[in-house]
């Protein structure tokens, strides 16, 4: 194989790998996806069935936008309404998940 073609292949592989590594998650994204997304939705909008069953509003709802990060943290940590308290997460993980969720709108 000519040297130029081999160099182009190596370069394209290196660029592909580098771009895959650069797509990093925010600190709370993995936690949100694992622990919150099933109810609150991937984009912060719950499915119609989940919204009705659990009385969940989308992150874009004015009532949700009006909540502070501390209020959301407390709701996650202690539970609120039909949402049970989050267990097995540190305060930092809950705060990171809240920050990620608030950024979805």
Regions found by a protein language model. Name each.
Residues 1-12:
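Bacterial N-terminal signal peptides that target proteins for export
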Residues 75-76, 87-105:
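C-terminal capping alpha-helices of c-type cytochrome domains
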Residues 57-70, 85-93:
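Electron-transfer interface patches adjacent to heme c in soluble/periplasmic c-type cytochromes
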């Amino acid at each position: 194989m000519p040297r130029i073609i081999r160099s182009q292949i190596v370069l394209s592989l290196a660029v592909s790998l580098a771009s895959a590594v650069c797509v990093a998650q925010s600190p709370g994204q993995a936690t949100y996806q694992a622990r919150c997304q099933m109810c609150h939705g991937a984009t912060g909008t719950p499915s119609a069935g989940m919204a009705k069953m659990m009385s969940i509003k989308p992150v874009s709802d004015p009532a949700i936008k009006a909540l502070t990060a501390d209020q959301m943290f407390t709701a996650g940590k202690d539970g609120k309404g039909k949402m049970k308290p989050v267990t097995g997460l540190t305060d930092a993980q809950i705060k990171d998940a809240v920050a990620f969720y608030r950024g979805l709108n």
